A protein has these predicted regions:
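Gly/Ala-rich beta-loop-alpha elbow adjacent to hydrolase catalytic centers
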Residues: 186, 216, 220, 224
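Sec/Tat signal peptide C-region and signal peptidase I cleavage site
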Residues: 17-21
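Lipolytic serine-hydrolase domain surface
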Residues: 22-97, 131-132, 143, 151-210, ...
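Bacterial N-terminal signal peptides that target proteins for export
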Residues: 1-6
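Structural motif
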Residues: 121-124, 211-213, 244
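Bacterial N-terminal signal peptides
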Residues: 7-15
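Short, surface-exposed "cap/lid" segments of acyl-processing enzymes
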Residues: 109-162
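Acidic, polar low-complexity linker/tail segments
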Residues: 90-120
């Protein structure tokens, strides 16, 4: 109830900040979604490939540019068919974040399909890392997500932001630039979610018994951090829409919670934050040398003693298995069963197991 009240009071103020910053929406498929639990859900800012006659819909496999578009889709893992559902376009400049009202928002359809028709009450939004082509994002990352968290699918929907990332991990700096650009497109999704939750008339008629988590892995953390920095620079207040924000393998700098560095505002968009630290993370060790600065998921926050109680830091180094080390200790979100259970199901006050 407090969250709804906050949204009702704050979101109208956003509409007065920059009234010209709007989102145009277009339905591409209004048919009811299948109740098949194997269908993945994602949204992407990649460029849509013009399909030839008889060809399936797909997106640019390698794409680094900002599009000002978000496509919301379902994906059939068996037939590998992409079902375009909806497109949202930001009509203001590339770097400006939307603040105006959103007509015909896709969020209402998501609520109807998943909450009303399927009884799903938990929504987990995921911003993955870079070094992923589009094919790898949906056929590897999303497939493993559905498989490894299969026991949760009856009550939880996993929705992935398949952002325009670099296709090779070695091209690290290009991946950083792609995260910077994709942060601008992520503003479309975040504003639509905030506007949906602020619709007091809708919630008077529908049950507000849903929860939202945001999970960022690897460079997805940096994408979120850049989004927060730019939003603060534009003077747009944050809205507490998430019950928990979870930072895994964070490639954000170790001072990310310092004033003006982005994550100092995380508790303004979520009730609590969980940060996992693995001191045996190979890719983050390489990132440390490339940036000449410690990484949040490797060494932890520099100002850890000054963090509020709602931000919990858990070191998971002792739980990294030999299997995790085969991927240099960076892929435990989709590999380590002990940590997977803890990430989704445990309270922040719960201690991690002392060993595997």
């Amino acid at each position: 109830v407090k969250r709804i009240l906050h949204l009702v009071l704050v979101v109208p103020l956003l509409y007065c900040i920059k009234s010209e910053a709007q989102i145009e929406t277009r339905w591409l498929d209004t048919s009811a979604s299948s109740t098949n639990k194997e269908l993945g859900i994602f949204f992407t800012n990649r460029k849509l490939v013009d399909p030839g006659e008889g060809e399936d819909v797909t997106f640019k496999n390698r794409w680094l540019r900002q599009t000002r578009n978000l496509y919301f889709c379902r994906y059939d893992f068996e037939s590998k068919e992409i079902m375009l559902k909806y497109r949202a376009t930001k009509t203001c400049s590339k770097k400006k974040y939307p603040t105006g009202p959103v007509d015909n928002s896709f969020m209402y359809k998501v609520y109807e399909d998943l909450r009303i028709n399927q009884g799903i009450r938990n929504f987990v939004f995921i911003i993955p890392g870079h070094a992923k082509t589009f094919d790898k994002q949906i056929n590897d990352y999303m497939f493993r997500l559905q498989r490894n968290y299969a026991d949760s699918l009856r009550s939880t929907a996993f929705i992935t932001f398949a952002w325009s990332s670099e296709s090779l991990g070695a091209l690290y700096y290009r991946g950083q630039r792609a995260a910077d650009r994709s942060a601008n497109d992520f503003s479309i999704f975040e504003h639509m979610l905030e506007s949906f939750l602020a619709d007091s008339a809708f919630w008077q008629e529908h049950p507000f018994d849903i929860s939202f988590k945001l999970i960022c892995t690897s460079m997805g953390n940096e994408l979120l951090r850049l989004y927060l920095i730019k939003r603060e620079m534009q003077g747009i207040p944050l809205i507490p829409v998430y019950d928990r924000i979870i930072l895994i393998g964070s490639d954000a700098p170790a001072n990310a919670f310092a004033r003006g560095e982005g994550f100092d505002h995380l508790l303004e968009m979520g009730k609590s934050v969980l940060l996992l630290v693995n001191r045996r993370d190979g890719p983050l060790t390489m990132s440390l040398y490339m940036n000449l600065e410690g990484r949040l998921g490797l060494v932890g926050p520099t100002n850890i003693t000054k963090l509020p109680d709602e931000i919990v830091v858990r070191e998971v180094t002792h739980l990294i298995s030999k299997s995790d080390l085969s991927t240099l200790g960076h892929d435990y979100f989709l590999r380590n069963q002990v940590l997977m259970d803890y990430i989704l199901h445990q309270e922040l006050s719960s201690e991690l197991p002392s060993e595997l």
